[in-house]
UniProtKB/Swiss-Prot annotation:
GO BP terms: ether lipid biosynthetic process; lipid biosynthetic process
Domain of life per record: Eukaryota
Gene: Agps
Binding site for FAD: 187-193, 256-262, 269-272, 321-327
Record bears the keyword Flavoprotein: yes
Lineage: Eukaryota, Metazoa, Ecdysozoa, Arthropoda, Hexapoda
Keyword Protein biosynthesis carried by entry: no
This enzyme's EC code(s): 2.5.1.26
Record: active site: Y529 (proton donor/acceptor)
Assembly, per entry: Homodimer.
Annotated substrate binding sites: R467
Localization of this protein: Peroxisome
Site residues by UniProt (Important for enzyme activity): R372
UniProt protein name: Alkylglycerone-phosphate synthase
Pfam families in the cross-refs: FAD-oxidase_C, FAD_binding_4
Length: 631
């Protein structure tokens, strides 16, 4: 089928915003589509072969690693310290001659379902495309495997068609047509998944249609009295916050993928943001959510802040990872913008003291908006990412280092750091700071400056670009995360790092890095991130090797009492462990919900349960088997 696009450009039908009348809207302009930073043709602004903007990238120049792009403070900087860190850690020189991959000349031939296409064109006003590049950029997320497969043109199965619904009603039409004609649907939001969740099943024989929600990004209504807002699910995080900031409000949900991920994706993966201490995780922010399934629309009929009305079906949708339907609209809590934002940082003599500090902060429930603890390896990595300094700045840094090592008696090979973000009014921030620094002192911590704290949070959005630069230079690297009770936190960090070291030794990997950080704190535990990478220049299949070691690390995490995931989700790459994580009974309950809501397996992504298990039919009923209960 030649690439085509529906020529209809009429305004989308108005959404039936759940439970709220138009009298509650701030004004009529709120129901207009938001002009997004990401265009409909994603590849015009974003890389087709990796993370982020086309004009933002690490690169080598005259043997020095640099960063280009005006969207980040690091743009235009040379990074000689980072260059030395890479050369020492991985024993390689920066190669400035290697080229980045080129777009493929041909694309997999699309599978066509003629009756579906006929009805799509004849009975709907939905825009669509079968162009190769539109299909390619929506065939993957951001796992190492995804990007490596793109670079080497390994994808055998990509969406056969891309559709852009503009509202809830058009999603209803599309799901009805797909169910009628047995077409597989892949809900696609920001494409930032790191769990393999949106990768097309490579053996799927049906027509695959990527349902891109990017044109569903309206703010439908805002209720200032209740401090609630309703957005369509396709709005990107930075667009959502920009719109709310213009009204003096914020949701406060800032995951590391905030620039590109969507509201619907946050709900589908049970996302967490760096400021959850103040605003909550996504499940704390969601008041109401609307999802279209092949069996109908699932939503709660009340916008009350809390109900006791049986199981909460919001939580059937939260974490469903695109396997049950398409999330179309979300009602969220909002808060007034804080009047003050202030950064800080702390240094501790070792990681164990830092963990004890984090535990005490959580115990006393005095967390600032964000507090993150880095181990020594990650601390040194962050220091290496500082741009080239002036002579005087170098002298000052040397004096600071002498103060830490000579006067404080701290070993630079053991030191770790915590970054801090405070939000509120002046009195709130001053109170938070005083208490945090008082607690830190009990664990031999001392202030390390607001500038270091600010740099740490700024680098959050730049670090994702390093993975692709590393791949370009012959280094495979990726992060993985978990959550764990406090009494096993330090043990898990040590054990997982030791397991990775052991696995590298078994495989004769001599040049690698493994580090961790504690990124979120709770009453009963914490979230831990691990960063692992190794030199792959002499490895036949580096991604397969990386995944084998990561698999071992995940086994170690689980054996130490950690979770399968804190916020990345299960997807395909962790589905192997899902049944054990939720028990046989829990897995069967999910499967029953899947069969009821999606009996033809239209959303056959293979997330959560492996694809063959998700497709399995229930046992045939017998005379003693009661009828299935409806959800």
């Amino acid at each position: 089928m030649a690439a085509k696009r529906n020529a209809v450009t009429t305004e989308a039908p108005e959404s039936s915003a759940p439970g709220e009348g138009t009298a509650l809207a701030l004004d009529s302009r709120l129901s207009k589509r938001v002009e997004s930073v990401i265009p409909k043709k994603r590849h015009e602004a974003l890389k087709w072969f990796g993370w982020g903007y086309n004009d933002s990238q690490f690169y080598g120049k005259d043997g020095i690693i640099c960063f280009r792009g005006e969207k980040y403070p690091l743009g235009g900087c040379e990074l000689p310290s980072f260059t030395k860190w890479v050369e020492k850690k991985f024993d390689l020189r920066v190669d400035t001659t290697k080229q980045y991959p080129q777009l493929p000349r041909t694309y997999p031939r699309p599978v066509e379902n003629a009756p579906f296409l006929h009805e799509l064109k004849g009975t709907t006003q939905v825009d669509y495309s079968a162009e190769g590049i539109d299909r390619l950029v929506r065939c993957h997320g951001q796992t190492l495997n995804d990007i490596y497969s793109l670079w080497h043109h390994k994808f055998r199965r990509i969406p056969d068609l891309v559709v852009w619904p503009r509202c809830h009603d058009e999603v209803v039409q599309l799901v009805r047509l797909a169910n009628k004609h047995n077409v597989m649907l892949v809900p696609f939001g920001g494409g930032t998944s790191v769990s393999g969740a949106i990768t097309c099943p490579q053996n799927e024989s049906r027509m695959i249609c990527a349902l891109d929600t990017s044109q569903m990004n309206r703010l439908l209504w805002l209720n200032r009295e209740n401090l609630t807002v309703c957005f369509e699910s396709g709005i990107v995080g930075q667009d959502l916050e920009r719109v709310l900031r213009s009204e003096g409000l914020t949701v406060g949900h800032e995951p590391d993928s905030y620039e590109f991920s969507t509201l619907g994706g946050w709900v589908a993966t049970r996302a967490s943001g760096m400021k959850k201490n103040v605003y909550g995780n996504i499940e704390d922010l969601v008041v109401r959510v609307r999802m279209v399934t092949p069996s109908g629309t699932l939503e709660r009929e009340c916008s009350a802040p809390r109900v006791s009305c049986g199981p909460d079906f919001n939580h059937v949708i939260l974490g469903s990872e695109g396997t049950l339907g398409v999330i179309t609209e979300v009602v969220l809590k909002v808060r007034p913008l804080p009047s003050l934002r202030r950064y800080g940082s702390l240094a501790f003599p070792n990681f164990e003291q830092g963990v004890l500090f984090m535990r005490e902060v959580a115990r006393r429930r005095c967390q600032p908006a964000s507090v993150r603890l880095m181990d020594n390896e990650q601390f040194m990595f962050g220091q290496a990412l500082k741009p080239e300094k002036s002579w005087w700045a170098s002298v000052v840094d040397a004096m600071k280092q002498r103060y830490v090592t000579s006067w404080k008696g701290i070993d630079l090979n053991q030191i770790c750091a915590a970054t801090l973000l405070f939000e509120g009014d002046l009195k709130d921030v001053q109170r938070q700071e005083a208490l945090i620094y008082e607690i830190a002192e009990k664990f031999q911590g001392f202030p390390a400056g607001g500038q270091n704290g600010e740099r740490g949070y700024i680098l959050t959005f730049v670090i994702a670009y390093i993975r692709d630069f590393g791949l370009h230079q012959g280094i495979v690297a990726e992060s993985f995360e978990t959550s764990v009770p406090w009494d096993r936190c330090s043990l898990l960090c040590r054990s997982v790092k030791q397991r990775v070291v052991s696995e590298c030794s078994k495989r004769s990997i001599n040049y690698y890095t493994i580090s961790c950080r504690v990124t979120q704190t709770y009453d009963a535990g914490a979230c831990i991130y691990f960063y692992f990478g190794f030199r792959s220049t002499d490895v036949a299949d580096p991604v397969e090797l990386f995944e084998a070691i990561e698999h071992s690390a995940r086994d170690e995490i689980l054996s130490c009492g950690g979770s399968l995931s804190h916020h990345h989700g299960v997807g395909k790459i962790r589905s192997h462990w899902y049944r054990n994580a939720v028990t046989e009974t829990g897995s069967s309950l999910y499967s029953a919900a899947k069969r009821h809501l999606d009996p033809k397996n239209i959303f056959a992504l293979g997330n959560l349960l492996p694809l063959e298990e998700a497709q399995a039919s229930p046992p045939p009923p017998t005379s003693s088997t009661p009828p299935k209960a409806k959800l």
